[in-house]
């Protein structure tokens, strides 16, 4: 799974604002994906890649994710790629999904 366009946009905007971010992505190895596919799983079921961008802004920690199991990423039940949107974790109990990079920036600016 490739990094989504919205995550790239978000990282570029964070750079423009001089907000330091950390890439905490978990890229699933191609060998593991191929092994799972050889066992009958689809590409979508086999690729459990999760892209994560972590940053602190106005004394709040944020985690933005895209990938397997995220809102806007790959649905873990149907294995369908749902789209090119981001999920913002404000805290463990408050995820917000189906966001563009602009949506994420608007949310953090209002916090």
Regions found by a protein language model. Give the residues of each.
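Amphipathic, interaction-prone secondary-structure segments
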Residues: 21-80
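Amphipathic alpha-helical segments
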Residues: 3-22, 32, 36
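Ampiphathic alpha-helical segments that act as solvent-exposed interaction surfaces
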Residues: 6-11, 82-111
């Amino acid at each position: 799974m490739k990094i989504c366009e919205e995550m790239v946009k978000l990282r570029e905007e964070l750079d423009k604002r001089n907000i330091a971010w950390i890439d905490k992505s978990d890229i699933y190895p191609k060998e593991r994906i191929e092994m799972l596919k050889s066992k009958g799983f689809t590409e979508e079921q086999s690729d459990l890649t999760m892209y994560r961008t972590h940053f602190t802004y106005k004394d709040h920690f944020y985690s933005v994710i895209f990938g397997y199991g995220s809102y806007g990423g790959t649905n873990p039940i149907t294995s369908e790629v749902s789209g090119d949107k981001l999920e913002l974790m404000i805290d463990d109990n408050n995820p917000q999904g189906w966001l563009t990079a602009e949506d994420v920036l608007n949310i953090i600016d209002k916090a």
